[in-house]
């Protein structure tokens, strides 16, 4: 099944109906993921289109809609990993609200970011070094090793807070017929890492909770030398509910149309479940023509 994220166009619309009609008319998708840039003012039009049977929803990306005090896409504005109880509670409450909206719109999935370990944001530093031709130079390796040591030493309390929040959220989702996908993240600082995710899923042990693959994010991590994209999917792929489908131009330009970058979809897609949801998550800078062309290529290779 394929779907299309509103992250492509939510920022340029003030009416939910027009946002969804652009997706239907310009790129040809009748199934949509509501991204994390959906302002509350867009929701009446979204509900109207759904009630009229003009659109279906595959998924909502937390937080959806945005908290009223937040004016632009901010999926990490409140974090389950925070040391501050008030922030964690706000994150949980906003997530429960997203689950309620998903139930109302018949969307089976909600995609989650879980937070981060507070540390120097090493990912962007490493990308900057790569762009200077210093991949695996001494400076690069030194920074990377130091970051790994720091994260491994600091992560346990952050992970514990994330696990406590996810248990509550998964229990709530179980009564709403909504499943939760923990997104594979771009930043090494973010939670969970690929080492942590299988353990986290095992410990919570809920059928409501699974993995949400992001082809662009994980390709960036491969480009940085943190993992092997194919081997990671061989390990985790069958626990994926869905994925954000995008390509990545070396080293870290993601949210590109499939088949325009370095992601080897032909060998990676078969490692995901046959019922996996594939959501096009495109940069707003990509044209409708570029997207339509990628969809046609996808259908040639993988069918609808």
How does the language model describe each region?
Residues 75, 140-146, 244-249:
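Short, basic/glycine-rich phosphate-binding loops at helix/coil junctions
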Residues 7-11, 61-68, 115-117:
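Short glycine-enriched loops at secondary-structure junctions
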Residues 50-74:
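Short hydrophobic interaction/assembly module
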